Amino acid sequence: MRNLILVGPMGAGKSTIGRLLAKELRLPFKDSDKEIELRTGANIPWIFDKEGEPGFREREQAMIAELCEADGVVLATGGGAVMRTENRQALRAGGRVVYLHASIEQQVGRTARDRNRPLLRTADPARVLSELLAIRDPLYREIADVVIETDERPPRMVVLEILARLAELPPR
């Protein structure tokens, strides 16, 4: 396995699960959004405000291309990374892809107090999350080697299921 890549919506647990997986596998953990923030010296909401979503997505595409060239990392992506064909191709080629699926209710609960989510600056975040998932779910599934449900499950149990499911896959 070159890399282990986590995709899924906001609030699915990609960063939390990714850190635990990296520790378990003794691999470095990278979060594409955090890497963008480190490189630019600006947080994601500021980038959205100054460059708009298209500007952020350009930065994200470059970061994903770079991170997928690595060897032996656990990578958590932003929820919208799958929207670009180039990202989906890079993620698929970059390693094993795990789709962490979470219900809208779980996503709302996990993101409610997070001010770093520009797309959720709205009166009705559940509606926005529902609309985003309707568009993105087929794209997550398109590139996923494994789909894992995260609702009402402790992160450690999710990690154990991911490792077990990946062990069952034939080499590629």
Swiss-Prot record:
Keywords of this entry = Amino-acid biosynthesis, Aromatic amino acid biosynthesis, ATP-binding, Cytoplasm, Kinase, Magnesium, Metal-binding, Nucleotide-binding, Transferase
Where it sits in the cell: the answer is: Cytoplasm
Q: Which Pfam families match?
A: SKI
Q: Mind telling me which InterPro entries this protein's record contains?
A: P-loop_NTPase (IPR027417), Shikimate/glucono_kinase (IPR031322), Shikimate_kinase/TSH1 (IPR000623), Shikimate_kinase_CS (IPR023000)
In terms of superkingdom, the source organism counts as: Bacteria
* Amino-acid positions noted as binding Mg(2+) in the UniProt annotation, renumbered to this chain: S15
Which EC number(s) does the record attach to this protein? 2.7.1.71
Q: What is its main location?
A: cytoplasm
Q: Which cofactor does it need?
A: Mg(2+)
- UniProt-annotated binding residues for ATP: G11, A12, G13, K14, S15, T16, R117, R153
| Catalytically driven reaction(s) | shikimate + ATP = 3-phosphoshikimate + ADP + H(+)
Q: How is the cofactor bound?
A: Binds 1 Mg(2+) ion per subunit.
- What pathway does the annotation place this protein in? Metabolic intermediate biosynthesis; chorismate biosynthesis; chorismate from D-erythrose 4-phosphate and phosphoenolpyruvate: step 5/7
Tell me, what is one Gene Ontology molecular-function annotation carried by this entry?
Answer: magnesium ion binding
An example of a Gene Ontology cellular component annotation for this protein is:
cytosol
Q: Which residues bind substrate?
A: D33, R57, G79, R136
Q: Which GO terms describe its biological process?
A: amino acid biosynthetic process; aromatic amino acid family biosynthetic process; chorismate biosynthetic process
What does the record note on quaternary structure?
Monomer.
Family annotation (HAMAP family):
Shikimate_kinase
Function as written in the Swiss-Prot or TrEMBL entry:
Catalyzes the specific phosphorylation of the 3-hydroxyl group of shikimic acid using ATP as a cosubstrate.
Q: Which family does it belong to?
A: Belongs to the shikimate kinase family.
Instruction: List the NCBIfam families.
Output: PRK05057.1 (NF003456)
This protein's name:
Shikimate kinase
Please give the organism.
Pseudomonas syringae pv. tomato (strain ATCC BAA-871 / DC3000)
